[in-house]
Amino acid sequence: LYTAPDSCEGRCGEPFSEEDECHCHPECGTEHNCCEDHERHCGPDGFSSSRDSITDQELLELSERLYELDHNKARPGDIAINPQHLAGPDETGDKRDRSPQPLYKYVNEELFSKPTYASFIKLLDNYQRATGTEEEVTAEELREQDHFLREVMRTELMQELFVFLQGKNRYSSEQEFLQDLKEMWFGLYSRGDGERDSSGFEHVFSGEVKKGKVSGFHNWIRFYLLEKQGLLNYFSHNFNGPWDTFPDVLGLQFSWDGFYKEVGSAFIGCSPEFEFGLYSLCFLARPGRACHLSLGGHRLSVQTYPWTKSSYGSGRRFI
């Protein structure tokens, strides 16, 4: 469900946008359309003064910097893909396999021995894909979450993101940032009837099945590993980004063990920390809205959604 953000946390002084449910621009008081917590965050003593809001220009500049800092991404010879059929708008929903060959012709699996890749892959078998099935989190799985977070925070890319967010008064310490990432991404919430059956990480990276359709599932590593096992059948693509190096972006149609994904977009060839960092940035800066970025001189938008039915900490939302 799309819900515009209903808080001024981190939004003070941002320009008026009709997309928003409530507003945080300087004139909202006289226009009587401020968010309820406007005074708390944006008043003289508020946490989010206008200098702490994240501007559109800063998002463009920081995303370019994170793109440059993705030292663990695939090199040109590391991956060969075979996109085959380009589906038109009238074809994406008809569940026809128009590509006889797999999407991935070759992946240099030495990539997967890099610490952030290895710790990421360990997380992928921790989930029940069906929504409505309670997730049982073992002590080992909690250790795997902590290990992944430690590894990504060792990268220059995630350090750059942390320093930026700390400068915007979002976090006072790296430990606070790490703890919030853990809750935001791995905290469980219910997509069904009260069972704690989902998390941001499971939805975005591992994928879920809801009402007979694939939901989420935006990660190239997960796609490659399942395709290699014969559990995923690539059908077609409806978008191929303008990038001629990795990461690239594809819009995909595929079947996962008989369940269909009509349009699934994915970065191809980026490191786990790049995706994790970029999505975290967008969720913190533009929750529930399009987050406009620039990668290698090409524009792209990422849409994140806050889970509005439950929260953690003092009203923070899961991704």
Give the predicted meaning of each segment.
Residues 26-30, 173, 270, 310-313:
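Generic detector of ordered secondary-structure context
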Residues 45-296:
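N-terminal "domain-start" segment
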Residues 12, 24-25, 181, 278, ...:
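Generic structural hydrophobic/aromatic packing signal, biased to beta-strands
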Residues 2-44:
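Secreted, short cysteine-rich peptides and small extracellular cysteine-rich domains stabilized by multiple disulfide
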Residues 300-319:
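Extended hydrophobic
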Residues 1, 26, 44-53, 316:
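Polar low-complexity intrinsically disordered regions
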Residues 16, 294-301:
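Short linear interaction motifs
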